[in-house]
Amino acid sequence: MFNRLLITVCALYASGVATAQIRVVSYNSAQFNGDANAMAEVLQAASDDDSHGFAVPVSIFLFQEVDEALLATLQNVVGSGYSMATFTDQNDSSWGGAQAMFYNSTQFVENSALHEDIFTGAGRHADRWALNVSGYSGKRIYLYSMHLKSSTGSSNQETRRQGVENVRDDIMTLPTGSHIIVVGDMNFYSPNEPGYIWFTEAGDGQVIDPLGNGDWGGGSNTLKHTQSPLLNQDGGLIGGGLDDRFDFQFLSSSLIDGGGFDLISGTYRALGNDGNHYNDAINAGNNYYFPGDTARGNALADKLIISSDHMPLIADYQVPAILGWSFEDDRVLVGADANFLVRNDAQVVVSQGADVLDVDIDFSGGLSGSTSVSIPAMSAPEEVALPVDTSISGSWDGVVTLTSTSPEVQTVPEIVKLSGDVIEHANASFAFDEDLDWYTYDISFDGNSGVQSFNVWLFNYGFDGSQSLLEIDDVTTPDLPIVFNGLSTNSVGSIPALMEFEIDTDSVPPDTYTSFLPISFSDEDLAGEQNGISMLTVRVDVIPSTSCDADFDGDGEVDVADILILIADWGGSDPAHDLDGNGIVGVSDLLLLIAAWGPCT
């Protein structure tokens, strides 16, 4: 039945993640006596769980009560995006099931040579795995999973204690300061049990209960309980309601010391446990596990009671900060800061998913001084102004030494040799040999001479290798009939930009045409970039190409407009309109105008 049901659930999991942030889930699979579809949906819900502020794909699944014959089935439920770690079954399947671990292979690489089986009594074994953390040189997490002997009574308690002793003895063989997560169905009934005390008492190999060593019995501690999510037995799933804390994730002190790899405060929880179902089924009435989304909580609770008779445990862990830096200000403008960027490159979903990066920065060589920065994960890079004199142009060099004081970031300081140049600002000018910011360009053309083109040069005055290029950002469109046809280049160094203009002399009467053209410019896109405006005035005279006496308006043609001018002066004595020179503007002048009708020749 289990394999047949899997046909509908194999596609639930994505194959990869884009984060280094760690989420660990431990879950007693109840020897797969539950519903396969429900199990797959519960595991997906573990990745989607944002009840404590954020969701992140599960990095590591640890299962108890796993039958070797169903490993392929379990792999399908977990999803193809996870790799199965070393699996061993020393007849554990006959004694309550073996242990299995699946991990995201984009985050970890298993060191299989470090796998161990540890006898824990009652025919069962704990497994120890070692995962090297990708992206962190030399960083490793050890994980233990176990299923200790169940039931009350001093004999069963002693069996559990002996199993814990064997596990703690193994922990003591690991390097000092190792990161260790110990999970499983421990079957501890109280913190007074010898096995629990053996795990948590001070000394070598101690592991810590994230919820503290206080009592977990009774309704006031329901949030801590993990068994059983169902009230009445359902096939192979044991009932009884939610009133026991059998499942644990114990941690080494290195995972709860506030730095580097570390448990994120407040994220240790039983998936779907809203604290309101003491000694009852987790789906009795409403489930408020997801704040403000009761329907979602109810849907999860319905899956939990048919998936297993335990609740999954989830804990989120921060990763160490990652020191990153960049330097792009090898060329800056006079008066600007030359900035060195320091980054926290930890790839996480939320800022608390990685440690804060604390860095001490020392300057030497041609530089001097020191400073320090603190950069939370997902923050913008911190700009550190280098102690460079940028008041004058010139070259510089120096050494920057970065030493992180954040745990587990680096083992040696990072030493960076730098050099750069301070350059002068660009200087727009309409002349090569002088700084000319305001300029009037005069030119004349004969009327009726067609389209006439003309050019104006714009220089970067004084340009050499120690000066910024001149970026021409905008040339104001001139008033018609003057037309701007564009620039030969928008970036001016030693070669000037050619601004191309034209005017159609056939379409306009003789006149003086003037246009004012503010030109916006700036430095290169460098630190200290400045903007400016130069003013160009273009003045074009269109003059008559030919003239005749009767062409009063000077447009090169005798026509109606000239008659109207003559009539307006009828009877007057203006010599310009007295074509026959008899001292009065009259009929004889009109006849002479008509005789000259048409273009002047």
Predicted regions and their residues:
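N-terminal signal peptide c-region/cleavage motif recognized by signal peptidases
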Residues: 14-17
